[in-house]
Amino acid sequence: MAETIRKSTFEKDFIERTYSSVVSDVTIAFSELVANSWDAGATTVNITLPSKANEKIIIEDNGSGMTDDEFQERWMVIAYNRVAHQGQYIEYTSLQGKAKRLAYGRNGIGRHSMLCFNDQYEVETWRNGTCNKYLISVDGGDSAFSVIEHNIFSREGHGTKLSVKAVKKIPQKKEVKQTLGYRFLFDPEF
């Protein structure tokens, strides 16, 4: 097993027991994951769905991305209070022609939706010319989740890419499309 770099201080199955709907229901999982892109000020979200088990699910956006410090302060905090720390409106990378957009996120739960598909997933997030790539795992010891691998490299632009190998559940394209259409297609800037 890889060395743990960072860890929270909760029981191994804390997320599964506490946030059962986001780690068990595919439609809720995708809704939460795309809501994270919305909250990051993304105008585009690309989703790749697997056709069979063990293929990757990829969700990539052009949102604001995170620095390593922001990742530590936001992603690694259980039940992160988004409104208290970032306000009720989202951050755009460019305000040009953009209306204010209320954030969906409140309780720091949606990021754990990747666990609906596997006990490990990758987060690649970039801004200010630096990309941080993390391998997250729930089997990293006594913590709720851990970063078991962290790589840093150069990358222009801004955004976040989540990827996970579909092992536990395989999302159906029609179901995902319908769920996301109900929640997000009303905004022409998204």
Predicted regions and their residues:
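GHKL (Bergerat-fold) ATPase N-terminal catalytic module, capturing the glycine-rich phosphate-binding loop
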Residues: M1-K161
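N-terminal assembly/transducer modules of large multi-domain enzymes
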Residues: W38, A42, V147-F190
